[in-house]
């Protein structure tokens, strides 16, 4: 019988304070897996690829929130090993199961009862002034280029396929994948992109300009962002809220679709739309309908009343029933990582 290998990725706090990690590891071993545990969430340096899990790893099970999943993504980026997220955080957009379903998750993993969802990754080349080759990195969620000096603006020029589109002073810009469109990009006013869309979006952050709106490009195009030589501030680049470094004036940053993808294990066929409504608790009943229901609860219709509260509760139950469980997280570095990717 072939050896089956699994890796459990979690964070130190969860491993030290709870029994969930021990329970998951025990169940995987009972199912015939040899299990390695990784709880080091320290971010590698920008442009440095940390050691990946071995190619004979069958699956990486993540116990945590989306921040822990982003850490796990660094371990599988150079492999075809899928990630299964079990949400131990708050929203857990990338996770597939909730913590109380861990028994079911392990059972499904042990019987290969899951499908693979391939997610687009963004590739970034950073050309420092005078450099003959770029520093390369990548992101599952987003790449941010922000001001290094919090009291000054960073002056940027934006190009698409080598055609200049805009230039402005700003707090920075976000370049997001579809997966990251429900994270920092969403908070900054960007649109939600469905995960199967092959596109990248750029969202300016507090740009001092009359025309500074989000831009969406197709997968064959490239965003080029130059930090102008006379910029008041240097830049600061960060991939997925983890790998980061300072960028001097005159740096060029180029972002395009990566040839690689990230593989997420999916245990259900719940559509992304249901996940979006459920995780964001979207108000599917508009204010006008609420007002009508409030009015109708005060009067009788054919001898019956229809209280608005009961209606709203019914909608909530219906949404929860349709949404199933999908899977931001206190263990993420940085304030912005409280927003999950989808």
From Swiss-Prot:
It comes from the Bacteria. Transmembrane segments: none annotated. The active site is at 66 (proton acceptor). Pfam families: NAD_kinase, NAD_kinase_C. Keywords: ATP-binding, Cytoplasm, Kinase, NAD, NADP, Nucleotide-binding, Transferase. Its cofactor is a divalent metal cation. GO terms for biological process: NAD metabolic process; NADP biosynthetic process. The keyword Cell inner membrane does not apply. Involved in the regulation of the intracellular balance of NAD and NADP, and is a key enzyme in the biosynthesis of NADP. Catalyzes specifically the phosphorylation on 2'-hydroxyl of the adenosine moiety of NAD to yield NADP. This is NAD kinase. It comes from Bifidobacterium longum (strain NCC 2705). The gene is nadK.
